[in-house]
Amino acid sequence: FADLLVVILIIAAAISMFSGNTESTIVILLVLVINAILGTLQHVKAQRSLDSLRQLSSPGAKVIRDGVKLEIPSKNIVPGDIVILEAGDMIVADGRILHSYSLQVNESSLTGESANVEKTDAVIEGDVALADRANMVYSGSLVTYGRAEMLVTATGMETELGKIAGLMNAAKERKTPLQESLDKFSSRLAILIMLICAVVFCLCIYRRMTLLDSMMFAVALAVAAIPEALSSIVTIVQAFGTQKMAKENAIIKNLKAVESLGCVSVICSDKTGTLTQNKMTVQQIYIEDRLYEPDQLDLLNQTHRYLLYDAVLNNDSSIVDDKGIGDPTEYALLEMFRRIEADTSSILKEANMHEDILRQNMQRLEEVPFDSDRKLMSTKYMLHGVPTILTKGAVDVLLDRCDYVRCRDGIRPMTEAEKDKIRMKNQLFSENGLRVLSFAYKESEENLDIHAEYGYTFLGLISMVDPPREESAAAVAASKRAGIRPVMITGDHKVTAVAIARRIGIYEEGDLALTGAELNAMSDSELEEQIAEISVYARVSPENKIRIVEAWQRRGNIVSMTGDGVNDAPALKKADIGVAMGITGTEVSKDAADMILSDDNFATIIKAVANGRNVYRNIKNAILFLLSGNTAGILAVLYTSLMGLPVPFTPVHLLFINLLTDSLPALAIGMEPADDDLLKEKPRNPREGILTRGFMITMITQGLLIAAASMTAYHIGLAVSSAMASTMAFATLTLSRLFHGFNCRGSESIFRLGLTSNRYSLYAFAAGVSLLALVIFIPGLHSVFSIAALPTTALGQIVGLSLLPTVLIQIMKIIRYK
């Protein structure tokens, strides 16, 4: 529309200049410049909003500076930094690998090859191709497995990816489905407007008007009809909504997600950190067939000591300035050890067991990092002169790999009865909503890989509590009121998951809970048939998550899926709204997601859904305001044309009206705050567009009322003179459209919404009325705008007629909602 409007304005200016109307020509060109400035400012504002959101979702990095592990924004990395790479990280700089632990990287963004590439810290001789540099990693690549330390060699545009980017033009921002839908509507509307203008032009010629007057009349109609602010208003309202969401910890990565949020009908949420506080605290330790509190451990007991070795050394987290860095579960194990340190410092010193001493003196020889398929993590150390593999992980997985058990009397073969007893203890912990890890070790000279993770000696269990967030139960209840089905998906034990889900209201009597194994035994049709009854999924794999999403989608639902790991990326991509965790999430999951929760909180998703619904509602109301106002202008011009009456508006009038009403008032409507009723409605059908039959009827009805008020003023003025008629019609159409902004704030009466609840609407109205008053009351502007001086009586009639459409529309709203 912007390009079309510019062409029409240039034509209007040319006609005015050709006819000798210098003042009109200057005004039209001035409006053209103002429109261009406003359009540019709107575009710049929208672009800055999107850029700021991209900054919020940019990856961070873990570095070692002065021997201390730190987390910093990736933009602060410089050559010479040592960066720690872990599975799920996005590599943000080029670098040379110093130490590699089974590191595998996806370099498809650079090489185009999707297969994972194994990396090494070995020296490579000679000048080799980029794809063969096994001891180098590159910006834009993803760590898919393992861990490493790298020395940064290049950042920004100096990286290999940066060099490629420098050769390319920036990709054009893709439009959202709503914008594309409006573009199609705008194209059809433009054709319709041109046809109407052609018909009106022919009617004017038929009525023996001059060629210039006929062209001016047709141009005036085109200017009145074109909602030139439509596209920019939609973009700005969406950008404003995303900024508001970002302040509430929901970072939207693309505008398409804003539209989809209002349609979400199912939220598949992880448990840990999202529904719970992610503040793990060790509760009890089961070791040597007894329960202990952490401070009851006997550090001179070899079994207890080896359990602590496993908890502290087989651990990638750290504590810097009393702040945990790394996985919260591993951080809880370090916190447990620190509590023991505080209580038993002298014994620890005697046993040489202080955390800092352990970590400094014990060098990690090998490791197999944790992954969601194995559900284990293993590392190899030299303990008391013997190479020892330390392993921790899920009880049901690790217990099956244990052949021995360590007790006070030493090591002996493990019986099935002992395994059953441990499983029973795990069950009891889980029923109380506790998370349980098992620990085992073996002394071995063999190289550590996944094939070595057998023949272990069992040490014990550590149970941890991760209490539900205080707001989780209320957020779950709110989601159900909003017609959204909450579903818990977790890697935890089924009993633990059900206990937490029941406490916060996700799991109710009659609901089903499935494990990943049970899910694998079901066909797709069986899953689709039963999925509405399943509230909890436990011990699931990434493939299971994709099946769950697809089953809900086949039933016509819009699905949101949360995730934080590398393997969650496919499910996040598959979901209609992929949600990554900002605190615990890997960069791979953030890259795949549409939205990032900077607080990892389920309640934030519900707030984002409410904001998404509000953005869509505000866009719909802003479009109604623009189109109903322009409809009024079209109907007024058509009425006088068909009735053989003088032209009610000049192009300058209509340009002024559009400039006044299509900018600030429309933006103010787009900033209407959300209300509690948004989460009492059912999710919107994504297949239902804005321009529904009901919307069109409302638009035409409101346009008719405004046009009728304007034409009534026109006839009152016509009794005096055609100049008075034009002036009264112009003032009434302008003022009634400004009043109409209050009608379009919502579907309910302004008395229920509150006149002052949206201060932007008041500011826009005051600005519009002030500018209209300047035109009417400053004599020097009368000739420029081709208007007559108005007597007091006429001013009263204009105000009364301008208010009439708003009064009638408000009465209709009150009757409808009673």
Where are each of the predicted segments found?
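Hydrophobic, aromatic-rich cap/lid helix
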Residues: C744
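Conserved cytosolic headpiece of P-type ATPases
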Residues: F1-K680, I690-L691, L704, H715, ...
